[in-house]
From Swiss-Prot:
Protein name as it appears in the record: F-box only protein 43
Pathway in which this enzyme or protein is active: Protein modification; protein ubiquitination
Gene3D superfamilies linked: 1.20.1280.50, 2.20.25.20
Organism phylogeny: Eukaryota, Metazoa, Chordata, Craniata, Vertebrata
Record: residues binding Zn(2+) 1: C583, C586, C601, C606
Biological processes per GO annotation: meiotic cell cycle; negative regulation of cell cycle process; negative regulation of meiotic nuclear division; protein ubiquitination; regulation of mitotic nuclear division
Effect recorded for T336A: No effect on ubiquitination and degradation in response to calcium
UniProt PTM comment: Phosphorylated on Thr-195 by CaMK2 in response to calcium during egg activation, which promotes subsequent phosphorylation by PLK1, ubiquitination and protesomal degradation.
Residues that bear Phosphothreonine: T195
Organism: Xenopus laevis
Length: 651
């Protein structure tokens, strides 16, 4: 019975140490800035340890009713001890932290739990987090805590006794490590490993399963040999914390994590970088982020690194499609700019450079082969349509080709067809072929139809045109240009008509010069007025101005200059409200105003100011009087006048 009580007391001391360790674990994790206190209540670890302690305390309370001297009945002791040994025997050969199927914990929490149980130099402030844990501590205070047995049980573990913590929550360790707490949390989120440290011991941990972590380790490291060595060891007991923490199949030694932590952050693996779209960086609008910014963005992610990497891998196809579309748009913009600017400048120098450069073709070939085929097909189509072999007898297409070249070379577009065909060195076009070109004179302000017909040697069309024109128009055509004169001279009938008309003009001019009358000089230019010529001459000679005492100069003969020319001279000096009217005294042109009813003779010798109604001296606003300056009646009436007609009727 005494031996049974001693064994049971030792067992309860181990459970008390385990409870104390679990409280250390909860308080230390709750003090970390990266984890919230709400996780502790929902963690399966706390529920599992709580259930185990509840079974012990319930058994203790039931045992008080049976016997106050006995802590636990032998039956319950044997049952609980047997269950504990069976569980430890099942988990002993694995040498790794068991895993719970509900939720996995981060590496930092597992490291802190292992360091708290191993008695390292980490300082944790133990605080009671819940009323339930306080009640459990009070119920177990009567049992003497046996910390020595707990430390002795850990001494049999395959790990070395000396531990060096990777990261703590104190400021001192953060300054020594040179990195912030967020970066350590990043490394713990990226690494998924157990708490075995193999850097100093000869014993090797279990072999690793398939590598799920993105942080790659070298296969030739010393840890691989140690893993094979420790695979054969199955007899050493495991740590007591193996029953309370999560299980994990994948393990990464702490030495590799501490040694390769900086290297894995600064130099990512090539395989993962290749999964991303490297072609996005070729865009001018893309700017690559620095490593510090990428690290800071990753540290905000509290999940595993596999979830962080899996998203870009899933969307890699969408990113490739977007980048390809962006490349195509950029290629089209470059081709448009090249066609508008650089292509015209290069072609103006005389060098036939293709539209697409070699560098541009290589860039388009990477993005899409269709883009290059489109531009090459357009270029070959233009060269095939406008080659010199196909345009031998087609002057219109040659002119079009030269106009296109001039528009691209920024040359003046206002040029004739001869200039366009003469500037193109590859075409040698004779001048006769231009005569058959339809529409080459379109757009010109003036166009010589007769000259074009003469150049085309269309004499029958010219003959039909000249037959419709009278002799006077033919004479006028000869005075227009040499081409029209040649057209008239080449046509026999038009030329004979022209000669006959010139002879007639000469004879009429000779007959007109023989007349010696004064007024006949003004009518010599009009050769067709021969009907009443003699009558008009007689009338002018018989007409005499009235003799009166007012104007002594009226008796003088009229100046030999033509009155018609005098009228023209005075008419040039008229205002808009003035008109011409013959003076009642000298019959010279006089200016009169219809509104004022007043007229003034334009001749300096006369200068008569008269009224346009009564033809006497201007009297202003007064009514016209009877004593007006009327013309004296003539003895002989003029032929053809009203008086002469009345005389004839009377006779």
């Amino acid at each position: 019975m005494a031996n049974l009580l001693e064994n049971f007391a030792a067992h309860h001391s181990m459970t008390a140490g385990a409870k104390k360790k679990a409280d250390h674990q909860d308080t230390s994790v709750s003090q970390d800035s990266g984890y919230s206190d709400s996780l502790k209540g929902f963690s399966p670890d706390s529920h599992k340890s709580g259930n185990f302690l509840e079974t012990v305390t319930e058994g203790y309370e039931n045992s008080e009713n049976i016997d106050p001297t006995l802590i636990l009945s032998p039956i319950k002791y044997e049952l609980s001890w047997g269950a504990d040994t069976r569980e430890s025997k099942q988990l002993a050969p694995l040498y790794e932290t068991p895993r719970v199927g509900k939720k996995e914990f981060s590496l930092r929490r597992r490291l802190l739990i292992s360091k708290a149980t191993s008695g390292g130099n980490l300082d944790f402030d133990v605080s009671v987090c819940s009323a339930e844990s306080c009640g459990r501590e009070k119920s177990l205070r009567r049992i003497p805590s046996h910390e020595g047995s707990l430390s002795n049980s850990f001494a049999d573990s395959p790990r070395d006794g000396s531990y060096e913590p990777i990261a703590t929550s104190t400021l001192k360790t953060e300054s020594e490590s040179g990195t912030s707490c967020k970066k350590w949390r990043l490394s713990f989120a990226q690494q998924r490993s157990s708490t075995l440290d193999d850097s100093k011991s000869d014993s090797i941990p279990l072999p690793e399963v398939e590598n799920i972590s993105p942080v790659q380790h070298s296969l030739a490291s010393s840890t691989d040999d140690s893993i094979l060595y420790e695979e054969t060891i199955f007899g050493a007991p495991t740590t007591p914390t193996c029953n309370f923490i999560v299980k994990e199949e994948f393990q990464t030694p702490i030495s590799n994590l501490a040694a390769n932590f900086r290297f894995n952050l600064c130099t990512p693996d090539v395989g993962h970088v290749s999964d991303f779209d490297i072609s996005v960086t070729e865009d001018s609008a893309f700017h690559s982020l620095s490593l510090d910014k990428s690290q800071d963005s990753i540290t905000d992610h509290e999940g595993s690194f596999q979830e962080l990497i899996q998203k870009p891998r899933e969307t890699s196809k969408a990113v490739n499609n977007k980048s390809r579309l962006r490349k195509l748009d950029r290629c089209r913009r470059l081709s448009t700019l090249r066609e508008r600017g650089s292509q015209s400048e290069v072609e103006e120098e005389g060098n036939e450079v293709p539209v697409l450069s070699s560098a541009y073709k290589l860039k388009v070939a990477r993005a899409s082969v269709d883009e290059e085929n489109e531009f090459s097909s357009d270029e070959s189509r233009v060269h095939s349509l406008l080659s010199s072999d196909d345009l031998t007898g087609k002057p219109a297409l040659r002119v079009l080709h030269e106009m296109l070249l001039r528009s691209t070379r920024k040359r003046p577009q206002q040029a004739t067809v001869q200039d366009l065909l003469g500037s193109s060195g590859c075409f040698e076009l004779p001048e006769d072929s231009l005569s058959r070109l339809i529409g080459r004179k379109m757009g010109l302000e003036t166009f010589d139809i007769l000259a074009e017909l003469k150049n085309r040697n269309l004499k029958h069309i010219l003959a039909s045109i000249l037959d419709l024109v009278n002799a006077a128009s033919i004479c006028s055509m000869c005075r227009v240009s040499r081409d029209w004169r040649d057209v008239v001279l080449q046509d026999k009938s038009a030329h004979q008509r022209r000669k006959a008309y010139i002879k007639k003009l000469k004879t009429e001019a000779e007959q007109g010069r023989q007349l010696s009358f004064e007024d006949s000089a003004t009518r010599l230019n009009i050769l067709s007025r021969s009907a009443l010529r003699s009558v008009q001459i007689q009338a002018r000679s018989a007409f005499r101005t009235p003799t009166s005492s007012l104007t002594p100069g009226d008796n003088k003969s009229i100046h030999s200059a033509s009155k018609h020319q005098e009228y023209l001279k005075v008419a040039k000096t008229l205002f808009t409200d003035e008109a011409l009217k013959p003076c009642p005294r000298c019959q010279y042109p006089a200016k009169y105003q219809a509104l004022k009813k007043r007229g003034t003779c334009s001749r300096k010798d006369c200068g008569f100011d008269f009224c346009s109604l009564c033809l006497c001296t201007f009297h202003g606003s007064k009514e016209c009087g009877t004593g007006s300056a009327k013309r004296i009646p003539k003895k002989e009436a003029l032929p053809g006048s009203a008086q002469s007609k009345r005389n004839l009727k009377r006779l």
